[in-house]
């Protein structure tokens, strides 16, 4: 039954996800792990001139139309530019992108798009020697986020001291952020937000 439903679309080179399936067929389809049932991100590799152009080329418009027809995102990326950025520090990267009229690198956009598609987000922990990003599902509680670091932190969870990335960058130091009341204490059921910087208080 499933493959009879899918056959006409596949013979026309249309993705399996374009076919409207009932609940029973969807359950069966998941067992086959069909590639064209999976969500898609289109990445269009262009040159630097096209990246900073005020209008899309005919080819790029066609890719965007295909992506839109599938409800997918289209990320425009310049592989040569990304290779050049690797050898630059953060400030040089920012200046280079600004000179091209580009807000963020294609790789950054691709990562963010993948996170959105997979329902993921990240939070940060920051110490004197290390800043680290942790990946968790969107909608995770603070205690679940603590468990992403270590099960003992989740088990002995007391409070989470949190400041947003933007607030800390604006304040420049933890001390200033604390003076301005930007740091806050949250309980285990706090829903984590993208870019939260967290210090977990725990006892085991």
Predicted regions, residues:
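Short, small-residue-biased leader/transition segments that mark boundaries at the very start
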Residues: 1-2
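A structural signal for well-ordered alpha-helices, especially hydrophobic packing surfaces
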Residues: 7-14
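Conserved catalytic network of the ASCE P-loop NTPase/AAA+ motor domain
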Residues: 32-36, 67-68, 192
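Canonical P-loop GTPase G-domain recognition
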Residues: 39-41, 47-127
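Short, surface-exposed secondary-structure boundary micro-motifs
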Residues: 202-203
């Amino acid at each position: 039954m499933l493959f009879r439903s899918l056959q006409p679309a596949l013979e026309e080179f249309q993705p399996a996800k374009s076919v409207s399936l009932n609940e029973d067929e969807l359950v069966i389809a998941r067992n086959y792990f069909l590639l064209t049932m999976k969500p898609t991100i289109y990445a269009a590799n262009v040159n630097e001139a096209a990246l900073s152009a005020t209008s899309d080329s005919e080819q790029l418009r066609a890719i965007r139309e295909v992506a839109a027809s599938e409800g997918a995102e289209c990320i425009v990326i310049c592989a040569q530019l990304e290779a050049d950025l690797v050898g630059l520090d953060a400030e040089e990267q920012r200046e280079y992108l600004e000179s091209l009229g580009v807000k963020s690198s294609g790789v950054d956009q691709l990562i963010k798009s993948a996170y959105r598609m997979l329902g993921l987000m990240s939070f940060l922990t920051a110490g004197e020697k290390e800043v680290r990003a942790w990946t968790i599902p969107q909608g995770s509680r603070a205690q679940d986020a603590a468990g992403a670091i270590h099960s003992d932190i989740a088990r002995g969870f007391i409070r989470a001291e949190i400041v947003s990335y933007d607030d800390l960058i604006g304040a420049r130091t933890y001390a200033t952020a604390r003076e301005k009341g930007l740091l806050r204490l949250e309980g285990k059921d706090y829903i984590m937000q993208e870019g939260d910087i967290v210090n977990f208080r725990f006892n085991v």
